[in-house]
Amino acid sequence: MNFINSLSAHLSDWVLRLASVCLAALGLVVIYGVVMRYAFNDAPPYVEQVALLLVISVAMFGAASGVHDAGHIGLDSAVKLLPAKGQFWCLVVVEILTITFAAVLLYGCEHMAASTRHDTIPTLGISEAWRYVPPMIAGVLIILFSVKHMLALFTKKTPA
């Protein structure tokens, strides 16, 4: 279990840093686009598409890191009223639902990437499939982090 905790902590740290870099790049790209449009009346055509890819990356990588830290939104007021065994099984159901969501996300993005891999984003000259890479990476990480949480639940260890 220590190996899994260590691996997931490193992956979460890595993906959070990647999200931070994407967020900083997003800010720079948007500022560049605004300055070019309004100060020089010469809007670069690629800014919107780069910004879209960066927004997707920030959201997906941030979500994966949030799942690792158990920082996702939880409405647990009613769950806290349950006995310990009921709380345990509610947590298990949450992890199962999270894994299911991530698996569907991964499957859907893989399908969309495969069906759009020959299409090109005109202003960037890259495949449309690249739009689906960050959600696929996030899907794999969310599954890994949720499995780690479930293992911790069943072995009575607090996830790191």
Q: Where do the PLM segments sit?
A:
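Alpha-helical transmembrane segments and membrane-interface helix-loop junctions
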Residues: 1-160
